[in-house]
Amino acid sequence: MQWIRPNSIGGSNSRSNLRTARLRGHSTLMNEIKIQVKTLPHFEGLPLPQHQTEGASGIDLLAACQEPITLQPGDRALVPTGIIIALPPGLEAQIRPRSGLAIKHGITLLNTPGTIDSDYRGEVQIILINHAREPFTVTRGMRIAQMVLAEVVKTKLEVVDNLEGTRRGAGGFGHTGH
């Protein structure tokens, strides 16, 4: 069996412990990184967010609301998670919808993916929207979104007179068919 060892986050093993996992019969290296989290008073009594399976990309975020929040059809609400995270430079946290809430209840995120930057130190909050025809109630401890870490590439724009042409050109918004 051959192993390919990718660069760890930040290029240093000290910032990331690599562990091996066996996923669907394939050997894979998964990066594991510890993220500092501060819990707020309204988080008390809830478990820390975690991966639900060995191969899960994201950790499920929980609603830390004190009272149930009912979303009428078309309504949106800012739902607290009760946590503040400290990401190292070079990482972002992407806040994504949970597919089960979307397919079963029409609940998704209004801005998806939401981005938590490495220099943000406020509470992680989730903007939920109800696309269904019936009301939906968010209760304390409900898994409402998932958080996936991603590496960030800094962008520096450079103004030029011409761009290299491509076969696609300026075609967009459905130009390739359905």
PLM segments and residue spans:
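Extreme N-terminal basic, low-complexity initiation segments
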Residues: 1-12
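DUTPase catalytic domain/fold
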Residues: 2-4, 17, 26-178
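Intrinsically disordered, low-complexity proline-rich regions
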Residues: 14, 21-24
